[in-house]
Amino acid sequence: MKKYSRYAIYYAPPKESSLEEFGRYWFGWDPLNAKLINNKHRINYLKRFGIKNLINIDKNVLIAKKYGFHGTLIPPFKLNKNYSTNTLFKKTEEIAKKFKKFKFYKFKLKKINNFYAFVQNKKNNNINKLSNRLVRELFKFRSPLTKKEIDRRNPSKLSKLQLNILYKWGYPYIMSEFNFHMTLASEVTGNKLYLELKKIERNKEIILNEINNFDKIYIFGENQKGMFENLENFSLS
């Protein structure tokens, strides 16, 4: 039986949708099937956007790649030793059933500090309500933060509100600080990746035209190789 060091609650694009296909080839990691994607296949796919090689992509997606293409609802956490994964799954399914599926707004490319992501063109209160509910009701499943985990969040650079959220809920960018996004690259240096992303943005309808409804939430787990893969998904009502 596989062991997972951390768990996360995500939105993931529907399997075989144009957006899921894009994320799979962009990162070279398929979290829904837990497998790496051959670089030759990636280049063949990305040619449709005018991207001819992976050099500018791969050096900027190494960190984001391990998490798979997703939108975070609850960021990765270690499971409290007093609870089992089955209990976590059952509670997550219970919460999912309390929410009705809803519409996404249109997506656009945005630079946020030193990373790039797809974001909706306006705040979606439905996603915020879902994330907040998940954070509150699944908080007991989270192991207490260690000093090392707190230090990783650079507390001296956080606002007072973000610091309070970190200590109360385990992560600074949730609850009132939550902003749904689907990361494309993080820790970006230089502007070469931006030029590749502009090619994606000019053709974004190819990958975004099928994504209308937010209708499922996913539980991902961090495997022994440090890659996050899908473990289960639950439909909204």
Model-found features: residue ranges?
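Surface loops and adjacent helix of pleckstrin homology
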Residues: 121, 222
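Small/polar glycine-rich anion-binding or flexible loop at a beta-alpha turn
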Residues: 213-221
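Generic recognition of long tandem-repeat/solenoid scaffolds
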Residues: 116-120
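Basic, often amphipathic N-terminal segments
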Residues: 1-112, 125-211, 224-237
